[in-house]
Amino acid sequence: NVITSRHLFGNTFSLLTSTLSRFGVETKLCDLTNVDAVEKLVDDNTCCLFLEVMTNPQLEVVDVRALTEMAHRHGIPVIADTTIIPFTQFSAKDLGVDVEVISSTKYISGGATSLGGLIIDYGRFPFIGKRLLNEMLFNLGSYMTPQVAYMQTLGLETLDARYRVQAANALALAKRLCTLKPICNVNYVGLEDNPYHQLSL
């Protein structure tokens, strides 16, 4: 079984709860902001903890270090989707994540000119699936085309600058929306009254 959040990107949710369930993989959905509750779901069949560092679209922020420490006590690897927070602003490896997945179509590409994804295995767990991974890469392909790699390299050159401008614009917009009377709630972690603000820092 896989333990993960109730709040996930739609395609990830579908993969875990529909596609993988056909192959006998149970997905245990829970509130990843409650580490004790997550730990109670761990059993002998738990193969990994999957998390989004900041959930999409709810924008819940999880305590990555606390979750990885708990998972590692039980010998469980942690896979983290860090797409929504660029790696220039966040280091999953330093917080104990074992495998990081990133949709490079988003921030890295930058100009919506290419599709791509990254899987970064930090080599902390002797995954029994290495043989299966090699077979999958052989059958499905493991490399970007040169054109896609080139387009994404161009995006990398401006990633940090683009992210800083986007973050400043998002904060300014969130603050402005807070002043408009018809709007009753603004869910943005950059706002100091957001319940995840301190954790997101």
Per-region residue spans from a language model:
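Conserved PLP-enzyme active-site core in the AAT-like
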Residues: N1-P182, N187, E192-D193, Q198
